[in-house]
Amino acid sequence: MTEATTTAAPVETPLPEATLQPDTGEESFHEHEARTMALTSHETAFMAELAPHAGATPRRGLRFVNVYRLIRTSLPLHEHETLVGGEGEQTAYRALLTQLAIVTGAPAIAPVYFDHLAALAAGNLAEAREYKGLADLIAALGEDDRVTASTEAAPLLGALQILRDSVAPQGLGNDPALLATLHNTASVARRYSFTARPH
């Protein structure tokens, strides 16, 4: 007599725990990096305007772009709205990009620029103050022999003029608030300067 053979029912193998982890709703590092490195059209347009003043060589131009991307990636996502704004209306990204263009395209006289900026910003906070803005900063630099005698005067003053033109429709061409924004973002730009790093 032949015994009947029985086949055991297949046992379902559970998936590895790694694939069963709950969705926390949090971005991974790579997702965060991808989102923060994606520049807005407002940023790329302003960078294109500044590019001729950010250095006479492709290498300097590439450094200008890459440094800004690096800074942007280091920011939490919630700070991007403050940096750029939904319509590109914020001045912080323009102030930062302008100063990155200066340290890249006019490294020899960048320290002179930062000295003038600090002096005017401090004057705006003094008790007996006469408010100064970007137009005053440009004028002061244009009267400084260290600037006018330098071959880097054109990229320095050119970058600042582009910033001034960009904020003119908002009525900020000589607003002390813009000078304060330049001063507040100056330390970030100076970290990536070979000649004007903060002490």
Predicted regions, residues:
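The feature marks long, low-complexity, polar/acidic/proline-rich intrinsically disordered regions embedded
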Residues: M1-H199
